[in-house]
UniProtKB/Swiss-Prot annotation:
Its main location: membrane. Belongs to the GRP transporter (TC 2.A.7.5) family. It comes from Bacillus cereus (strain ATCC 10987 / NRS 248). Involved in the uptake of glucose. It is found in: Cell membrane. This is Probable glucose uptake protein GlcU. NCBIfam families: RhaT (TIGR00776). InterPro entries: Sugar_transport. The chain crosses the membrane at residues 4-21, 26-48, 52-71, 84-106, 110-132, 153-175, 180-197, 210-227, 232-254, 266-283.
Length: 285
């Protein structure tokens, strides 16, 4: 039962972008709707959990949420250019590299020889995985498609910065996840509005995309529940499995076309990235 709870965040988070794309509306309406969904869920959780909200918790939570919105909005922009099945493995890989290097440099996480070896191997696996999942078909090598890929990668780098700050600012100030949940959601909504209001995102698609926001917040809740039961290392490793759902879902559910060579690269690349996530989880423990 505990392992099942620990897998739920991966299932929920892995399906979010599939819902975003299926529900439609483009990256701006998708971002805004998702943030409002997260806020609704967080208000309900706050009513039942009643965590203590200090000025530090509120401030840190809002900043974290603002940067989450930056990460999510740019990830959805990249999906608009490159598709789910290409964007998500690269995005996951970049996030793992960024959070790992920050953890090593700032928090000195790799304190033993084994953790250093596992960490370095994990980073190598991530690089290999990202390269394999980025393979282009001959058709995609034309000027327009190549331009979309380059723009998509640049946008993903911005997205990675957003997701990195979203994660590490909570840890830097040692804020409890349950306490940060509501302020975080407020920051997400503020960030979503600031990043999208020029593009007139307030439409029926924004309302539809409240659903992915509810799903994201539910995944967050199950992560908080599972961590004390299975440990941070195991829950972190299992949460990376969402890449399987999002990537294969992009191909099988959204109908993104891939050549046999690309499919092979994606499957093998996912294996490398998941292996890296597991190794990083062990290195953290």
């Amino acid at each position: 039962m505990d392992i099942f709870l620990a897998i739920l965040p991966a299932i929920f988070w892995g399906s979010i972008v599939l819902f975003n794309v299926k529900l439609g509306g483009g990256p701006y309406s998708q971002t805004l709707g998702t943030t409002f969904g997260a806020l609704i869920f967080s208000i309900v959780v706050y009513i039942f959990m009643k965590p203590v909200l200090t000025p530090t918790v509120i401030g840190v939570g809002i900043v974290s949420g603002l940067f989450w919105a930056l990460g999510q909005a740019n990830q959805l922009k990249s999906i608009d250019l490159m598709g789910v099945s290409r964007t998500m493995p690269i995005s996951t890989g970049l996030q793992l590299v960024a959070t790992t290097l920050f953890g090593v440099i700032v928090f000195h996480e790799w304190s033993t020889t084994i953790s250093v070896v596992l960490g370095v191997l994990a980073l190598v696996c991530i690089i290999i995985g990202v390269i394999l999942t980025s393979l282009q078909s001959e058709e995609e090598k034309n000027a327009e498609q190549a331009g979309n890929f380059k723009r998509g990668i640049i946008i993903l780098l911005i997205s990675t910065v957003g997701y990195l700050v979203y994660v590490v600012v909570i840890r830097l100030f040692n804020v409890d996840g349950w306490s940060a949940l509501l302020p975080q959601a407020v920051g997400m909504v503020l960030g979503g509005i600031l990043l999208t209001f020029k593009h007139h995102p307030f439409n029926k698609y924004a309302i539809r995309n409240i659903i992915p926001g509810l799903i994201w917040a539910a995944g967050n809740m199950f992560l908080f529940i599972s961590q004390p039961r299975v440990g941070v290392a195991t829950s972190f490793s299992l949460s990376q499995m969402g890449i399987i759902i999002s990537t294969l879902g992009g191909i099988l559910i959204l109908g993104e076309r891939k050549t046999k060579r690309q499919l092979t690269g994606i499957v093998v690349g996912i294996v490398f990235i998941i292996a890296a996530g597991i190794m990083l989880g062990i290195a953290k423990s």
